Amino acid sequence: EKSHLSFSVKMRLGWEDKEEWKPVLDLLNNIPLKQITLHPRIGTQQYKGKVDMESFDAFYNTCKHSLIYNGDLTTIEDIHRIENSYPKLAGIMIGRGLLARPTLSAEYASGKEYSEAERRNLLHAMHDRLIAHYETTANSEAQIHSRMRLFWEYMETEIGRKVYKKIMKAGNLKNYLNAVREI
């Protein structure tokens, strides 16, 4: 009996070597997959250094499946660059870029980059909704504080180093909220 499920693969170029993808893709090209998402780095690199666009280009030209690009997309320009360079892509995955700039997908969809003031206002609105949710689900102010600090983990560039450090060093919810008001 056939299953209604489809399978996708998310992968990097390799673990230690940027050529490790080649024999893997030979196998993947011969099995039924919905899509492949490629992050063009090697595993040992984690998120350090640059993505390897030369290797992505080779993968793109060899892959027989629908392909999704993933890696280092933090601006609308980054998205357009990938979109224009690889017109046969099935999609683009935004990971840490969206965590660092939560308005990025909305900016892309609207076709315009938001002003700093617009981004800050939307960031505060999102933050306030999240705080309100945690106030109804968390057991204590300490839990709310702990969870909310994670909200800012990738946003240092967006909010500035000084206020980011204040948020991270805030020892309790009151000090945390005071630091957030400085954004």
What are these regions (language model features)?
Residues 1-183:
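Flavin-dependent oxidoreductase catalytic cores
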